[in-house]
C-alpha cells in the first residue's frame, strides 16, 4: 500500500509540473519580419495549441520563431489532454534522440523505463 501511495504522489506531482502554464514565449504573436527573405520557420500558435510553419521575411523576429519543429515542440508542448495519465502506454515520439524516461505500467503497478526520442510522444 505504501508503494502505491508513493507512485500516486509521484504522478500527481509530475502532472502538476508538466501541465503548468506554457512558457511565455509560446504566447508571443508570430512576427513575419520586415525584410525580403522567404524563410519557413515554426512558431507556436497559442490559439490552436500547435507548432505551425509560417513565412518569415527576416529581420525583426521575436523568441516565438524556431528553425526546427522539435525546438518549437520542446519549448511549447501545447495543450495536453491528460485523461487518465496513469493508463497511458509509453510513446517514444518521432525524433531520434535517446532519453530514458519512465511510465507507470498499470498492469504491473510499477514504473518502468522507456526511450523517448525528444519530440512528440506522450511525455
Curated annotation (Swiss-Prot):
Subcellular location: Secreted
PROSITE patterns, A to Z: BPTI_KUNITZ_1, BPTI_KUNITZ_2
Protein's UniProt keywords contain Thylakoid: no
General function of this protein: Dual-function toxin that inhibits both serine proteases and voltage-gated potassium channels (Kv).
Boundaries of every BPTI/Kunitz inhibitor domain copy: 26-76, 86-123
Main location: secreted
Expression tissues: Expressed by the venom gland.
Cystine connections: 26-76, 35-59, 51-72, 86-111, 95-119
GO CC annotations, alphabetized: extracellular space
Keyword Cell membrane: no
Signal sequence, renumbered to the chain: 1-20
InterPro entries the record matches: Kunitz_BPTI, Kunitz_BPTI_sf, Prtase_inh_Kunz-CS, TFPI/VKTCI-like
Highest taxon above the source species: Eukaryota
Single GO MF descriptor: toxin activity
SMART domains referenced in this protein's UniProt entry, alphabetically: KU (SM00131)
Family: Belongs to the venom Kunitz-type family. 02 (native) subfamily.
GO annotation (BP), single: envenomation resulting in negative regulation of voltage-gated potassium channel activity in another organism
Keywords assigned by UniProt, alphabetized: Disulfide bond, Ion channel impairing toxin, Potassium channel impairing toxin, Protease inhibitor, Repeat, Secreted, Serine protease inhibitor, Signal, Toxin, Voltage-gated potassium channel impairing toxin
Protein name: U13-hexatoxin-Hi1a
Amino acid at each position: 500500500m505504501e508503494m502505491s501511495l508513493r507512485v500516486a504522489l509521484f504522478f500527481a506531482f509530475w502532472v502538476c509540473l508538466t501541465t503548468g502554464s506554457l512558457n511565455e514565449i509560446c504566447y508571443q504573436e508570430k512576427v513575419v519580419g520586415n525584410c525580403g527573405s522567404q524563410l519557413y520557420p515554426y512558431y507556436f500558435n497559442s490559439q490552436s495549441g500547435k507548432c505551425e510553419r509560417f513565412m518569415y521575411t527576416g529581420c525583426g523576429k521575436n523568441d516565438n520563431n524556431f528553425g526546427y519543429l522539435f525546438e518549437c515542440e520542446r519549448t511549447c508542448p501545447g495543450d495536453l489532454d491528460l485523461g487518465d495519465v496513469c493508463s497511458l502506454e509509453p510513446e517514444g515520439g518521432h525524433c531520434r534522440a535517446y532519453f530514458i524516461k519512465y511510465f507507470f505500467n498499470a498492469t504491473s503497478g510499477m514504473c518502468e523505463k522507456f526511450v523517448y526520442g525528444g519530440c512528440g510522444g506522450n511525455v
